[in-house]
Amino acid sequence: MPENRTYGTLEGPFVFQTDEIDRPQKVLVLLHGWGADGHDLASLGEGLQHMMPDIALWCPHGPAPCSANPMGRQWFELSERFFQSPEEALPEMETTADVIEAACEALCDDLDLPPSSVVIGGFSQGGMMALHLGTKGHFEAAGYASLSGALIGVVTPVADTSISFFVSHGTDDEVVPFAASKQAQADLEEAGYLVDFMARPQLGHGIDMATLDGLGQFCYKATLI
């Protein structure tokens, strides 16, 4: 069982199970989807550590109970209006981004790691938050990953950046359309960001082994120091 760790005001399972080194040198902070919690993604830790024995996985629970599932959590409210006017969620996303960044800073302090050793990723709503943090946040992570997510709002062009993104999506996603990630890729690249895009044929709203492999490869490249 992974241990539960609290950083800032967020808590969730922390996975680091290896006999090869004493403590992690890199961390993937992975944000769950709407109505789930951190335990939903913690099982990915073992697969990631087969690829990168020095990486830990921290899966914090969202800061608020899910409005449609009180047993789950959410990063921001996802009402029916969201699908017509997603930009209306931006003020709450900004507030949540501050909470996530404070947690990541506390994590780095505790593990004595620089932000360049951290990748922030997420699935579905968590992926939306990861893309938001990468384009509007202040915590300078090594990279940002969105799995079956979407980019909310306008991206400000950047003149020079080393920040990279991993964007993956199943072509048969019935919850968040595949086109959302294709649009995110286009908007990010137009703004000047580096994007690794992975389309997963016939995959619905989920994470398969190929996506996990792609995420692991991205984490490895992004955190090369």
Show the residue positions of the predicted features:
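Alpha/beta-hydrolase-fold catalytic nucleophile elbow
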Residues: 60-61, 121, 145-148, 168, ...
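Short beta-strand/loop motif that positions the catalytic acidic residue
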Residues: 166-169, 173
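Hydrophobic anchor at the start of a short beta-strand
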Residues: 55, 118, 165, 195
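Primarily recognizes the serine-hydrolase "nucleophile elbow" in alpha/beta-hydrolase
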Residues: 108, 116-162
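C-terminal catalytic histidine-bearing segment of alpha/beta-hydrolase fold enzymes
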Residues: 179-225
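Active-site loop signature of alpha/beta-hydrolase-fold enzymes
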Residues: 36-37, 65-66, 152, 174, ...
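Serine-hydrolase catalytic machinery in alpha/beta-hydrolase-like enzymes
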Residues: 5-113
